[in-house]
A protein has these predicted regions:
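Conserved short loop/turn motifs at secondary-structure junctions
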Residues: 41, 142-144, 223-226, 299-308, ...
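Metal- or metallocofactor-binding catalytic centers and their adjacent structured scaffolds
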Residues: 276-310, 316
């Protein structure tokens, strides 16, 4: 009997012919002559129908059936995201059906999965099950990530599939990527560590979520209202609550700034602020009426590198700052662009490309050059200066060692058409960021001018006194990559000033708005009159979180860093995954733990009460949750044992239950109903 391997290789040959239908049909008939008694079926399973249709079209499965497509020796079927889930407590024992403190902690001896209770899901699964049990080989075409691996593995386990499984692993949904993927199918066993990390995450979330939610609801809740506790959502809520308390407890304090205007240029005292009015006034009197002398003029030229390519979090941050898009909305938009083949796989946490992507970049750039929206080619003028030249190759862009499963988000080279306004905005950010990394550095000149005002010695002050002042200006000599930046809108600038804790791509050039100015020509030793001022100001509290700054805080476990290299290192201990952070924020809204006030994220009284109530650092500490995330990544990279992780978690959950049960207080929390959004009613009436 001819081996399945031979037939499989023959089909791979058919795939490589693309649209050469005559050759494809000839080879298919040739194959059938040698396998007359048995039709060997390869079942491909995708994560959603739209992806399945694209795959089916490429591999020649063009005949539609109920729940799958068939042709060319392939059957292509699909899930609808998750078809299976971990069993619920009552599936293990009837004792866990009712909520009772005496039944805690709930720790199954062995975790199991079950079909989600939905008629549509049950029908589709029965089709998948039948196809898989008859298949000679399965190709797992699930989303190329941890969650996608988990979705398909659970379905195959539930269907009791026994045949060999191959893995389609691609970073974009273009026809070329699908063909290349099928010509280079992987062994599913290569992705076992990825599956174990996903499984460990799911079990960990079950153990902590199920037990802690029941524990806190029964111990501290009332009126049968659920107090939801989660491994990621609770530390995220704690970030918001703690920031809010900082703001509420903040007491403004006055300080005074000494400055002077010389030749229409404002110079500020290098001493910094004065915390005492008397000290400030004394300094003011010292310089009043005395000449200002320039002591030093220094000019330096510098370069600013282009910002790195987007990962999911940095894209969500920029979309929130520029357009007000929520993290969830941005994820949905970039996912849609990926499924339409316009951008690469979005759920990534790297800002690098592997070296093998470099040869494909000129074609992508050429496609962007031809791209038009409303008859206008927005990228042609940006690309023209580097047209016909080899694209520069920088280690800040191409570094295979910084890429694991997927590379940074970039355009695929397919010219986008029929995009919604929101999709176009997101695509535009990705396209401009991609173009920017191949443009020259921005060149600028920095001018620093130091001056002083000296006072003569007096009876009360026997020594001569001098107060130093400084002014800094910067001038763009060659914008380089900065041409890809669109002018900031006034509203966005206001948002940036309100949240200085957030910087997605900071640089010395953009750190201070008042330094973006060109100074007059000053000469060392020149002197003249000046107008000193002493201005009283008040210290300000830290800003409220918005979605952009919260995403950054989740990424770095609550530690704010502006340096890109340091931020990349901090990602190892961030809380949540890039793909899950948006849903975590939405969960906090749905639980009425937080609400929006314009762009601000504000904790509700219930959210504040809940965090105040939780004493166990394990439940609300960003650092500890970040360590968990690090262990899950280590499981994926075979540096940590999954079984050990789960055993540790079981012990921690047992400790939490014991500690909360021993609380002698009778504290209670009431989940408040959602507060009405101001202005919502009026808007409705206007319609």
């Amino acid at each position: 009997m001819r081996s399945i391997c031979t037939t499989f290789l023959l089909r791979k040959k058919v795939l490589s012919l693309g649209k050469a239908k005559e050759k494809s049909v000839f080879l298919l008939l040739f194959a059938r002559l040698f396998v007359p008694l048995q039709i060997v079926m390869i079942v491909c399973i995708a994560e959603k129908p739209s992806v399945a249709r694209d795959i089916a079209r490429i591999i020649g499965a063009t005949t539609s059936h109920d729940g799958y497509m068939e042709g060319n020796g392939f059957q292509v079927t699909w899930t609808f995201g998750h078809l299976c889930t971990l069993k619920e407590p009552h599936d293990y024992t009837p004792m866990w059906k009712s909520w009772s403190l005496t039944s805690l902690p709930m720790i199954p001896e062995r975790f199991g999965i079950k079909l989600i209770d939905d008629n549509g899901i049950k029908k589709q699964f029965s089709i998948i099950e039948r196809l898989m049990q008859q298949a000679e080989r399965i190709v797992n075409c699930g989303d190329a990530g941890q969650e996608g691996e988990l979705i398909q593995r659970w379905v195959m386990q539930k269907a009791q599939a026994k045949c060999p499984v191959s893995r389609l692993w691609i970073s974009s949904m273009t026809d070329e990527a699908i063909r290349e993927g099928f010509q280079n199918l992987k062994d599913q066993q290569d992705y076992q560590p990825l599956y174990m990390a996903g499984l460990s995450r799911a079990i960990g979330d079950w153990l902590l979520g199920m037990n802690a939610t029941r524990l806190y609801t029964l111990k501290y809740g009332q009126n049968r209202q659920v107090l939801s506790i989660g491994r990621v959502q609770t530390p995220t809520l704690a970030l918001i609550v703690n920031r809010q308390k900082e703001i509420d407890n903040f007491k403004p304090e006055p300080y005074w700034v000494l400055a002077t205007v010389y030749r229409d240029t404002t110079f500020t005292a290098t001493k910094g602020k004065f915390t005492s009015k008397e000290e400030g006034e004394q300094a003011f009197q010292t310089i009043e009426g005395k000449p200002f002398t320039v002591t030093k003029v220094e000019k330096k030229e510098g370069k600013e590198q282009p910002p790195q390519l987007y990962d999911l979090t940095s894209l969500q941050v920029d979309c929130n700052r520029k357009f007000g898009f929520s993290a969830e909305m941005t994820l949905n938009l970039i996912q849609a662009l990926y499924e339409k083949k316009y951008t690469t796989y979005p759920r990534v946490d790297t800002q690098y490309l592997s070296d093998d992507i470099y040869p494909k970049c000129p074609q992508t750039m050429n496609s962007l050059y031809q791209t038009k929206f409303g008859g206008v080619a927005p990228y042609a003028a940006l690309i023209k200066p580097i047209g016909g030249k080899p694209l520069k190759k920088s280690k800040r862009v191409f570094d295979t060692s910084k890429v694991t499963d997927h590379h940074a988000i970039i355009p695929t080279g397919v010219i986008p058409q029929n995009l919604s306004d929101a999709e176009r905005k997101v695509f535009d950010l990705v396209a401009r960021r991609f173009i920017g990394v191949f443009l020259p550095d921005c060149k600028f000149s920095t001018t620093t001018v130091l001056g002083e005002v000296r006072s003569a010695a007096t009876e009360s002050q026997p020594t001569e006194n001098a107060i130093e002042f400084k002014a800094t200006g910067k001038e763009i000599l060659d914008p380089g990559w900065r041409v890809v930046r669109e002018e900031k809108k006034e509203k966005e600038e206001e948002d940036d000033q309100q949240d200085t804790s957030l910087t997605s791509n900071s640089s010395p050039l953009t750190s201070e708005k008042d330094e973006e100015r060109t100074l007059p020509t000053f000469v060392k030793g020149e002197s003249g009159e000046h107008r000193p001022t002493l201005t009283e100001k008040m210290t300000t509290p830290p800003p409220y979180y918005n979605e952009a700054s919260l995403l950054r805080a989740m990424e770095t476990a609550g530690k704010f860093v502006e340096d890109e290299t340091l931020r990349a290192a901090m990602k190892e201990n961030g809380i949540g995954r890039p793909s899950s952070r948006a849903s975590i924020i939405e969960t906090l809204f749905k639980r009425h733990y937080i609400r929006r006030e314009k762009k601000r994220l504000v904790a509700t009284p219930t959210g504040i009460e809940l965090i105040d109530l939780i004493r166990e650092e394990l439940l609300k500490s960003c650092e500890l949750t970040g360590i968990w995330e690090k262990k899950l990544r280590d499981i994926e990279h075979q540096k940590y044992d999954a079984q050990q992780f789960i055993q540790e978690l079981k012990a921690q959950v047992t400790d939490i239950v014991r500690d909360v049960m021993s609380d002698p207080t009778n504290r209670r929390i009431t989940v408040a109903p959602p507060e009405p959004v101001k202005g919502k009613k009026e808007k409705k009436e206007k319609k």
